[in-house]
């Protein structure tokens, strides 16, 4: 495992802190590193709150010359919060390591382009599969226009959900 793996894995751990809290936003984690030391970390707050990058910048205080590791391309549009990409640029980061591109049409590569246009070195694709898996609902909604749906069905061995009389019987256990 190299040093970049370590920081991106931490980003993925942080992103999971947003599980079931951040929709319709994606779960994002961000770690800021300078001179081999973590200077700030963050994850996306519930909708309307700060994004991961803003949380990490706030924790760092001074991010000049730092490398930003982030699980999803920083947003480049203003919604309930300002664009994260501009906050990273204004903070003076020197490098961004991004797991995956944001499929949201309002971003879709624009965040990466803005970073590169200001001279910030950008590397993409580190742990991309894991980052996409973490946000499969968000990604499917933007790439295919459909939600990610999860269904649980319990049936008896003969494919029934109740007896012929309509009376329901336990066919699963609490652990299921």
Language-model regions, residue ranges each:
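Short, small/polar residue-rich loop motifs at catalytic or cofactor-binding pockets
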Residues: 24-27, 148-149
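Generic hydrophobic secondary-structure packing signal
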Residues: 7, 11-14, 26, 38, ...
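Short, basic/aromatic recognition patches
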Residues: 3-23, 141
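N-terminal nucleotide/polyanion-binding subdomain common to many enzyme families
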Residues: 120-176
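Alpha-helical scaffold segments in soluble metabolic enzymes
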Residues: 10-14, 55, 59, 114, ...
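Zn2+-dependent cytidine deaminase-like catalytic core
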Residues: 32-130
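Residue-level signal for inorganic ion chemistry
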Residues: 11, 29, 75, 115, ...
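Short beta-strand scaffold segments in enzyme catalytic cores
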Residues: 27-36, 153-154
């Amino acid at each position: 495992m190299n040093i970049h793996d370590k920081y991106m894995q931490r980003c993925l751990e942080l992103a999971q802190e947003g599980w079931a809290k951040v929709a319709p936003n994606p779960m994002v984690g961000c770690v800021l590193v300078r001179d081999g030391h973590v200077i700030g970390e963050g994850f996306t707050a519930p909708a309307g709150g700060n994004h991961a990058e803003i949380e990490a910048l706030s924790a760092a205080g001074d991010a000049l010359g730092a490398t930003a590791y982030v699980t999803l391309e920083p947003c480049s549009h203003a919604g309930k919060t300002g664009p994260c990409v501009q906050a990273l640029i204004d903070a003076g980061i020197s490098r961004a390591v991004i797991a995956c591109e944001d499929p949201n049409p309002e971003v879709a590569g624009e965040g990466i382009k803005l970073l590169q246009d200001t001279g910030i070195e950008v590397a993409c694709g580190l742990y991309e599969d894991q980052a996409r898996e973490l946000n499969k609902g968000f990604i499917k909604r933007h790439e295919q226009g459909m939600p990610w749906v999860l269904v649980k069905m319990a049936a008896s061995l003969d494919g029934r959900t109740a007896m012929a009389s309509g009376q329901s019987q336990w066919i699963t256990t609490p652990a299921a």
